[in-house]
């Protein structure tokens, strides 16, 4: 049986790692062992932050909505409650975009939601 030499496969693996480490600083970009660790850590950060991105954007939409709704004399929590009571099912992302790009339409949504709130409050 012929002897199997692993030069081709290991070279391909090393090339793959170094390609992924392109743009890194210092020995992280050209030393296999260090580059491998750096790439692995980078992939861990990427995985973690893909999850965190969803939380971050939701928080951003809520901040924007809170600011926009306060201009109309409501707080964010009362606005969301009013939306639920009036049966308006629009997500926070869409409401945030509406508040930024279509202020008149957003004002109409706020007024519709306000009408669902009890007058005593």
UniProtKB/Swiss-Prot annotation:
GO cellular component term of the entry, any: ribosome
Q: What is this protein called?
A: Large ribosomal subunit protein bL20
Q: Which family does it belong to?
A: Belongs to the bacterial ribosomal protein bL20 family.
InterPro entries in the cross-refs: Ribosomal_bL20 (IPR005813), RIBOSOMAL_L20_CS (IPR049946), Ribosomal_protein_bL20_C (IPR035566)
Q: Which gene encodes it?
A: rplT
Q: Which organism is it from?
A: Methylorubrum extorquens (strain PA1)
Q: Name one GO biological process term.
A: translation
Arranged from A to Z, the UniProt key words for this protein are:
Ribonucleoprotein, Ribosomal protein, RNA-binding, rRNA-binding
Q: Record's SUPFAM superfamilies?
A: Ribosomal protein L20 (SSF74731)
Q: Which HAMAP family match?
A: Ribosomal_bL20
Pfam families of this UniProt entry? Ribosomal_L20
Return one GO MF term.
structural constituent of ribosome
Function recorded in the entry: Binds directly to 23S ribosomal RNA and is necessary for the in vitro assembly process of the 50S ribosomal subunit. It is not involved in the protein synthesizing functions of that subunit.
Per its UniProt record, what CDD domains does this chain match? Ribosomal_L20
